[in-house]
Swiss-Prot record:
Sorted UniProt keywords: Cytoplasm, FAD, Flavoprotein, Methyltransferase, NAD, NADP, Transferase, tRNA processing
Enzymatic reactions: uridine(54) in tRNA + (6R)-5,10-methylene-5,6,7,8-tetrahydrofolate + NADH + H(+) = 5-methyluridine(54) in tRNA + (6S)-5,6,7,8-tetrahydrofolate + NAD(+); uridine(54) in tRNA + (6R)-5,10-methylene-5,6,7,8-tetrahydrofolate + NADPH + H(+) = 5-methyluridine(54) in tRNA + (6S)-5,6,7,8-tetrahydrofolate + NADP(+)
Family (UniProt): Belongs to the MnmG family. TrmFO subfamily.
Annotated positions binding FAD: 9-14
Protein name per its UniProtKB record: Methylenetetrahydrofolate--tRNA-(uracil-5-)-methyltransferase TrmFO
Cofactor(s) the record lists: FAD
Length: 435
């Protein structure tokens, strides 16, 4: 007899896991504590809400996260399928209308006949086949139970979200539409800065007031989502190699490359909202308004959402998990999402996809499977379970996680294409073996 699967958390990983389990013909109880209990970062009651950027990053197969998306599409991913449905222009990236995206996923999950939604907080680890996908903002009571079960200290870092601006308040005479190196459609509004403007902006940023952290929390930032003010403090030129990099963004009015450029990315389908790319911040709201209005074109900008910052927790997965996302201590317990140390929206959903496939197999009396390292799904699972536990940090999908190709290819683009083609070929064999 097929057993049911209990999934805790309906974020990106939990939603994907529920979809995979139910589509394998296994009943699911999906627990989500919102709206009964809220988190500091979520704004809505929808599943798979995006709390940071609205971009799911690169879509090309010369980009590891692009390969990961394609692998997920081929496994009927609800997250990538819904992202494709609700995409907004973003050059070579896959960005979405954040509200439509989470609404689409919520509707699909709620209408699935094998998924039962339960809006309540879980404070202990249940019996039976369970996937815990409660994310970086796991409630205190469940966090404590997970730590007690795992017998090891959790880690944490801070994740910060960028401000969102009303497009109608941007001075369009001072900005220009362009994607870096003219890749894809011209999808970004670019705010050029002279050296003098940049220096004044940097000075204001490093001296702006931030929201103080609670005394018992130690600052620990993941490099991929570092607050802009922390980046600015690392040196006057640091931002010029990060979110303010001018390379490939020549100003069409002058034909020259500005000293610095700040990019604004479309945040909704109506193109009425734009976020400041890479400007995650923990500045006080009044300071955000003052400092970010120094950006050319944003002198009178209205902020529909200020940048916010919240704590993210993740486990010491190399010590605790198998590459199937099963607990080493209990075979019928799976973990998925950012709490496992995968970093990024797509990676979180991907871990939920694998945990879901394997939980469904277990429910049907079949053996869970490890995806080969030649696939992006497999390379991520391998990394988080084989890295050195002592120095374990969250990781994005990247080509450095894959095994080397049998032949050496000097050209980087050709090498990445070869890795991508191998990944999809190997995945096709895995899918065939699952049927």
């Amino acid at each position: 007899m097929t057993k049911k699967v209990t999934i805790i958390g309906a974020g990106l990983a939990g939603s994907e896991a529920a979809w995979q389990v139910a589509n394998a013909g296994v009943p699911v109880d999906l627990y989500e504590m919102r709206p009964v209990k809220k988190t500091p970062a979520h704004q809505t009651e929808n599943f798979a809400e995006l709390v940071c950027s609205n971009s799911l990053r690169g879509n090309s197969l010369t980009n590891a996260v692009g390969v990961l998306k394609e692998e997920m599409r081929r496994l009927n991913s609800i997250i990538i399928g819904s992202a494709d449905q609700t995409a907004v222009p973003a050059g070579g990236a896959l960005a979405v209308d954040r509200d439509s995206f989470s609404e689409t996923i919520t509707e699909k999950i709620k209408s699935h006949p094998l998924i039962t939604i339960k809006n309540e907080e879980i404070t202990d680890i249940p019996e039976g086949i369970v996937i815990i996908a409660t994310g970086p903002l796991t409630s205190e009571s469940l966090s404590q139970k997970i730590q007690e079960f795992n017998g090891s200290e959790g880690f944490y870092f801070y994740d910060a979200a960028a401000p969102i601006i009303d497009k109608s308040t941007i001075d369009m005479d001072k900005v220009y539409l362009k994607s870096r190196y003219n890749k894809g459609e011209a999808a970004y509004l670019n705010c050029p800065m002279t050296e003098e403007e940049f220096n004044a902006f940097h000075e204001a940023l490093v001296n702006a007031e931030v929201v103080p952290l609670r005394t018992f929390e130690k600052e620990k930032f993941f490099e991929g989502c570092m607050p802009i003010e922390v980046m600015a403090q690392r040196g006057i030129k640091t931002m010029l190699f990060g979110p303010m990099k001018p390379v490939g963004l020549e100003d069409p009015k002058t034909g020259k490359r500005p000293y610095a450029v700040i990019q604004l990315r479309q945040d909704n389908a109506a193109a009425s909202l734009y976020n400041i790319v890479g400007f995650q911040t923990h500045l006080k709201w009044g300071e955000q308004k003052r400092v970010f209005r120094m950006i050319p074109g944003l002198e009178n900008a209205e902020f529909v959402r200020y940048g916010v910052m919240h704590r993210n927790s993740f486990m010491n997965s190399p010590e605790l998990l198998k590459p199937t996302y099963q607990s080493k201590k209990r075979d019928d317990l799976f973990f998925a999402g950012q709490m496992t140390g995968v970093e990024g929206y797509v990676e979180s959903a991907a871990s939920g996809l694998l945990a879901g496939i394997n939980a469904a197999r277990l429910a049907k009396g079949e053996e869970p499977i490890e995806f080969p390292r030649e696939t992006t799904l497999g390379s991520m699972a391998y990394y988080i379970t084989h890295a050195e536990g002592k120095h374990f940090q969250p990781m994005n999908a990247n080509f450095g996680l894959f095994p080397e190709l049998p032949e050496r290819i000097r050209d980087k683009k050709e090498r990445y294409e070869a890795i991508a083609n191998r990944a999809l070929d190997v995945q096709a064999q895995v899918i065939q073996s699952l049927d």
